[in-house]
Every structure is written in structure tokens, then in C-alpha cells.
Regions:
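Short, polar/acidic, helix-capping and beta-turn segments at strand->helix junctions
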Residues: 1-118
Length: 118
């Protein structure tokens, strides 16, 4: 995260659990390629990671003003992700952009970029 004035910028936040190599909801083959994944588990994990980073930097979930979401499979994953997103953002509804991309640098299906106030 990077603080600029009263803003906090988070980028490249994925579902990997802190200080672990394991990615919740991802099964890899022997070559490290995604064999299967559970977008629901990844969504919950990425939101947990965002909350941790925000609080560690002196912000909070309710201070999020903008969310960019990168999904690797919009067709199959958007409805599940959107349902979970709505659960997390009941009281605070920031601006949001959801983009499908071909791949992410690690074997994950979702990554977030966040702007929050402090």
C-alpha cells in the first residue's frame, strides 16, 4: 500500500494467504498450472486481505472509494463474485470497475486495486 496525502492506494491484492504459498481455493497440477479453482473461496480471501492491509495502514473498509477488479473468467465467475461483493459492500458502495483479463502473474482468478481514504 502507498499513502499519498489522505489517500491510500492498494494494488495487486490477490487471494493468497499472508506469509503462505498456498492460494485458497486453487488446485495446481504438477507443472504449477491451475487444475481447478473455487472463485468463492478466492473472493472471500481477497476481501480479507484488503481489510487487513487497510486496517494495518490506518484506514478501514468503509473508507474505500474505488475498486478495480480483475477477473480471469468473467463468463463463469462474475455472478458469484458480484454476489459476494454485494455482501461485503452493503453499507459502503464505492465506484467499481470489473475487467476480464487473460491471466494474472500468479495462478489466481481475481485481483483487486483499491483506493481508500485514511
Amino acid at each position: 500500500a502507498r499513502k499519498v496525502g489522505r489517500l491510500l492506494f492498494l494494488s495487486g491484492v490477490g487471494p493468497r494467504a499472508a506469509n503462505q504459498k498456498e492460494i485458497p481455493g486453487v488446485e495446481l497440477d504438477v507443472n504449477g498450472k491451475i487444475k481447478s479453482y473455487d472463485i468463492e473461496k478466492q473472493c472471500h480471501s481477497v476481501f480479507k486481505n484488503v481489510r487487513y492491509i487497510l486496517e494495518d495502514a490506518g484506514s478501514s473498509w468503509d473508507n474505500i472509494v474505488d475498486v478495480q477488479v480483475f477477473l480471469t473468467n468473467m463468463k463463469d465467475d462474475f455472478s458469484t463474485y458480484n454476489k459476494i461483493y454485494a455482501e461485503y459492500f452493503k453499507n459502503n458502495q464505492p465506484c467499481r470497475t470489473t475487467i476480464e483479463i487473460k491471466a494474472l502473474p500468479t495462478p489466481i482468478a481475481i485481483e483487486l486495486k483499491i483506493i481508500s481514504t485514511i
